[in-house]
């Protein structure tokens, strides 16, 4: 039995890594999709601000995702625990801030650059662990991080001669800091017994609620909330974000990330810019 337990744990970890890689591919799709949606909506509402499009997109994207999940998992929600509510709220706080900054930043920078800068959490996470838990970053982790950053730089085709830190780049770096908090919250021992479906629903719905006041503050008119998606391309891009980049990617990440460390998760998520760069070619 003692030999079976480590084997079982290793198998579970390997399965978690595979599922996180799968989810990250769909998450990487969000970068070119959000970029394309930004261009589409600027044609529909040329006078609206990027913050309006960003906040409205978050409200619709996560609101629809949360409602769809609530319909399918209504029975589980009946006995939702206080810690599941708490974890969902914490994840929503970090998530909505990160997504708002990331989506607005995409209006001012390329999808591949946005995906590259978002990977800042693969550096932020081990630094946080080292500072808070007083655990030094091992040479193995250091070289893994260095190799990942170098590889992502090459694959995302980052040109440092023309690279600049403008509004889009700075917003994306701030988003990465918030995503760091989200990743760390998923592995917190306090939430180990939580059911991922329940706190994911809370997270999605609260992200929509948190973004709604920004929609109200930046909307040119009430009709603009409908006109922003009053075309087949805009509606189709929103559907892609809801189904693939939210329902599939987030629920898989929320379910499986606890079986790896936060540092490992951050390194796995670094394949995002590869997919984003490839998809941005089409």
Task: Give residue ranges: language-model regions.
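Membrane-interface helix-cap regions at the ends of transmembrane helices
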Residues: 36, 40, 63-81, 150-163, ...
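Hydrophobic transmembrane alpha-helices of multi-pass small-molecule transport proteins
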Residues: 69, 137-158, 176-179
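C-terminal-most transmembrane helix of multi-pass membrane proteins
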Residues: 2-9, 58, 62-63, 157-158, ...
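Hydrophobic/aromatic residues within transmembrane alpha-helices
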Residues: 37, 57, 105, 110, ...
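C-terminal transmembrane-helix exit sites in multi-pass transporters
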Residues: 76-77, 102, 121-146, 274-282
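Transmembrane alpha-helical segments that form core, pore/gating elements
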Residues: 24, 35, 66-69, 125-126, ...
